[in-house]
Amino acid sequence: MPRRDRIKPSFEDDESFENEFDYRYKRGKEQTSLNSDNENSESGSGSEQEEHENEHDVDDEMASISFGALNRAQARLKQEQLRRSQRDYESDSDSDSAPEETSSSSQPTNKKRSKHAPAVSSTKKPVSRIRDIPGLPSRKSQTLHSDIRFDAAYGKADLNQARKNYAFLDEYRKQEIANMESILKDKKSKLNESEKEEIRLQLQSLKSRMDSLKNRDLENLILKEYKKKQYQNVKEGKSSQPHFLKRSDKRKILQKAKFDSMKPKQRERAMERKRKKRLGKEFRQLEFRPLN
């Protein structure tokens, strides 16, 4: 059967279709509808022959479609399938879960957040049973070092009372100092130089700690005696009200009491350290600085 010549229509003039594929697709549908009408009116043998010819016509029409139109049609079909599958998935999830109300807070807004607004946390992170409150110690620090004697909830720590309660530790410190000195003096000891040096450092640290504790005890004793004397004067009528020391006066009284309690060699050593400190300060003030 000879192939019939066809004239392609100009799609630019046809405003009812977007592209060539829509035109071809609609024309094929019209041909199939005409064939179905002819089948009802004509006999079986004639209708089969015409149907066969019409199928060939539709195939020829589809074969003449350009590749660009086919690509666009394929992309549109993929988008439609994706949209349909997403719609089915959303309908399934909505049927399984309870209906939720859409709130305006879920929608993102460009409004600036207030600093007093509640904090936003992730829903993926499990909520702890004990929540951390800003401004208070964290739960981890409390579990690491928890000692009710030094808890802030019981008020400020009283160093004087703690010193009285643990005064018996001085005996252990003195005994430890004596043991270290005996080890260092023992010439038959099998310790190497590094171990001896470590013991010397520990001994020096322990002695300095004992000296600082003694100085603190002496300061507390002097201030306590001064307060007691002032209240005694008020009680006897020698003064109308007690005199409270300023920081500079307190420093002078403590320094005088320390020098009085020192031995002559200790006093000379302290005076020498003080003189060197003052001399170094004067040299730093008078040192030569080159002009730029």
Swiss-Prot record:
Provide ranges: composition bias, Basic and acidic residues: 21-30, 77-90, 257-271, 280-292
Protein's cellular compartments: Nucleus, Nucleolus
Among the GO biological process terms of this entry, one is: maturation of SSU-rRNA from tricistronic rRNA transcript (SSU-rRNA, 5.8S rRNA, LSU-rRNA)
Q: Region (Disordered) spans which residues?
A: 1-145, 255-292
Q: Does the keyword field hold Nucleus?
A: yes
**Where is the sequence biased in composition, kind Acidic residues?**
48-62
InterPro entries the record matches: RRP36 (IPR009292)
Cellular component annotations (GO), alphabetically ordered: 90S preribosome; nucleolus; small-subunit processome
Using the record for this protein, list the coiled-coil segments as residue ranges, or answer none.
173-217
The job of this chain, per UniProt, is described as: Component of the 90S pre-ribosome involved in the maturation of rRNAs. Required for early cleavages of the pre-RNAs in the 40S ribosomal subunit maturation pathway.
- Describe the protein's quaternary organization and the partners it interacts with: Associates with 90S and pre-40S pre-ribosomal particles.
What's the protein called, per UniProt? rRNA biogenesis protein RRP36
Q: Which gene encodes it?
A: RRP36
